[in-house]
Amino acid sequence: MRFWSLFLLVVLLAVGGQLPAASGRKKGERAGACPPEDGPCVISVPDQCQEDSQCPSTMKCCFQACFRHCVPRILVKRGGCPEDQLQCLSPTEHLCNKDSDCSGKKRCCHTSCGRECRDPARG
């Protein structure tokens, strides 16, 4: 009986170590998100980081334009953005860049014409 208890414990520990974190983040990945990409690739330079642990504690390793580098992480609000069913006829400038630009529970969402603050999708 003692053998099977020990065996079961070892199996559970082995399997548990293979599961992703409860938050859905990879091991070593910091909370928060990367800011939206800031434009096209103009000049390619070597990556400055490969993962969040290589950045100061308030930053994340993010891909921006051509390479990965440490940038300030941004707050991500709960809920997803609603699906945009419209086709843009006249693109507008972005009304937000990140969730913290939006009031209350609203999220900064990509739409067919740009980014704007919207209530999160239900479901």
From Swiss-Prot:
Signal peptide start-end: 1-24
GO molecular function annotation: serine-type endopeptidase inhibitor activity
InterPro entries, sorted: Elafin-like_sf (IPR036645), WAP_dom (IPR008197)
Positions of disulphide bridges: C34-C62, C41-C66, C49-C61, C55-C70, C81-C109, C88-C113, C96-C108, C102-C117
Domain WAP: 27-74, 75-121
Keywords: Disulfide bond, Protease inhibitor, Repeat, Secreted, Serine protease inhibitor, Signal
A Pfam family assignment: WAP
Residue ranges the record marks as coiled coil: none
SUPFAM superfamilies, per database record: Elafin-like
Entry-linked SMART domains: WAP
Keyword Repeat: yes
GO CC, any one term: extracellular region
Major place of residence: secreted
Entry's localization field: Secreted
Role, per record: Putative acid-stable proteinase inhibitor.
Protein name: WAP four-disulfide core domain protein 5
Species in which this protein is naturally found: Lemur catta (Ring-tailed lemur)
Highest classification ranks of the organism: Eukaryota, Metazoa, Chordata, Craniata, Vertebrata
Gene: WFDC5
